[in-house]
Amino acid sequence: LEEDVEILGPPVVELDLSSNQSVAMVAVRLSDILPDDKATRVTYGLLNLTHRNSHEHLEPLEPGKRYRVRIQMNDIAQRFPAGNRIRLAISTVYWPLAWPSPTPARLTVYRKTSRLILPVRPVNPRDKEVRPFAPPEGAPPLNKTLIQPTRQSWTVIRDLAKDESRLEVINDEGVYRIEDIDLEVASKVIENYVFCDDDYDSLRGETKWERRFKRGAW
């Protein structure tokens, strides 16, 4: 980008596409790409293509036929700095956010007749007059001591022998002590999702949430 670009509202993707299956899904993601190629997802949108005209009356696709579909992403307010790039990614799955189609589908997207519509916020001369928000008002933070640090991870494991993919998400809030009441608190969530390639009936998901409390002898 040669200059900053600000968007406010829902980005929209209009795709001219065809499918080799009667049921298919399309997922679109808008990302901010830094000069070092690190990416940050900004917003996304999903559409079951049998819902392209109505969520009430489903219409299977005719394989090979071209359709024009509109995917609206989630509303967002974002500034893309000059020097960064804006990336649009398109896929037929976005698991585990959305359950896959019953049969793997291949979509053909015709780029010349497809487009991305960004809700660009025009520059307003009065922008410089807008004062920043004051510091938020709220209760004072807990008087606590960190005993064990937090840990977050997102790991994808592929077993080529079993043709199996596994996703493990860990959100460990660590262990801390609330000093005013001498209470130790620990919280950890582990999510596991697994499926065998091309066998969507094998999809499984499990979430374990552990919370522990300790004070004195208990």
Regions found by a protein language model. Give the residues of each.
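Glycine/threonine-rich phosphate-binding loop and adjacent beta-strand/alpha-helix elements that clamp
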Residues: 1-218
